[in-house]
């Protein structure tokens, strides 16, 4: 199914080009803009990417972290202006594109080994 050229042109102008290369298993720090009343601040959400889905303007990724012993997952649109920047802190070595199995693991079992580059 072909995309309407007008829609393609509009979405092309909305795509961000400052996104680092990351995939499932990588640890990232997402600097999200939070609006509280009239104030705006940056909130850092640090965790492991457990999935990426979609393509183009509708692409999203989900980051999982453990906060006070409770697993917290947050899904971000990849090309949203609400995310100030994405930092990749380490690249994980995994064999899956979706890491849902991490939800059942706790402590050291939930660690992901680092991927060696080179």
Curated annotation (Swiss-Prot):
GO MF term set: structural constituent of ribosome
One record GO biological process: translation
InterPro entries (alphabetical): Ribosomal_bL19, Ribosomal_bL19_CS, Ribosomal_bL19_sf, Translation_prot_SH3-like_sf
Organism superkingdom: Bacteria
Keywords, comma-separated and alphabetical: Ribonucleoprotein, Ribosomal protein
GO cellular component: cytosolic large ribosomal subunit
Chloroplast among keywords: no
Family of this protein: Belongs to the bacterial ribosomal protein bL19 family.
Function: This protein is located at the 30S-50S ribosomal subunit interface and may play a role in the structure and function of the aminoacyl-tRNA binding site.
Protein name: Large ribosomal subunit protein bL19
Organism of origin: Ligilactobacillus salivarius (strain UCC118) (Lactobacillus salivarius)
Protein's gene: rplS
